[in-house]
């Protein structure tokens, strides 16, 4: 909270990519305001493109209430919170003492690259990265035969990771999951 104190006092972090997003998604927002309906195609960006990356809303989005829980903090402080929480949970699942878990989560959350992508507004990338420790922690719980919590954590965090809408890191998580499953099957055989 101290790191993002200016945000908590009402100031707004200028994120260049978010400003560009506002321009790219203007037609989508105007259409939604005029008709009350959702469009999945706009023609003002790149000569026409789908709106899946520009803030389209989906009727069966059950993950929004979960994501709203993290949005109690202003953007992008809420993403930093998810970084810290996810890595601390991973360290806890790995059975590190809480002091090492706290230090590890601070080292992860305040690493230079993760802060830079927040500064410039790569929020979807940051969100995708923030849920990776949750996915890994869930997989570890599954390997330890803690089926219920492992399934809940893996499926919810992977769904949130997909919801972040950043395909590059979704493929990375799929690689982690498939490698983990392959190693698990190998150890069983």
Question: Where do the PLM segments sit?
Answer:
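Alpha-helical structural context
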Residues: 34, 69, 93-94, 163
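Membrane-embedded helix bundles of polyisoprenyl
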Residues: 86-89, 93, 99-188
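Membrane-interface coil-to-helix junctions
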Residues: 1-84, 106-133
């Amino acid at each position: 909270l101290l790191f993002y104190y200016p945000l908590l006092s009402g100031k707004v972090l200028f994120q260049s990519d978010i400003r560009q997003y506002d321009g790219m998604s203007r037609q989508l927002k105007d259409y939604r305001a005029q008709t009350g309906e959702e469009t999945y195609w706009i023609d003002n960006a790149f000569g026409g493109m789908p709106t899946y990356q520009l803030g389209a809303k989906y009727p069966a989005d059950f993950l929004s209430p979960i994501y709203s829980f993290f949005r109690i903090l202003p953007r992008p402080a809420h993403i930093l919170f998810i970084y810290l929480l996810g890595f601390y949970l991973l360290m806890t699942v790995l059975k590190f003492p809480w002091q090492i878990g706290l230090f590890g989560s601070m080292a992860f959350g305040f690493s230079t690259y993760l802060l830079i992508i927040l500064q410039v507004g790569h929020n979807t990338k940051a969100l995708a990265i923030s849920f990776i420790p949750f996915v890994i922690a869930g997989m570890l719980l599954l390997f330890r035969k803690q089926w219920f919590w492992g399934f809940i954590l893996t499926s919810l965090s992977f769904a949130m990771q997909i919801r972040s809408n950043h395909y590059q890191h979704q493929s990375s998580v799929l690689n982690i999951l498939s490698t983990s499953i392959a190693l698990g099957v190998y150890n069983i055989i």
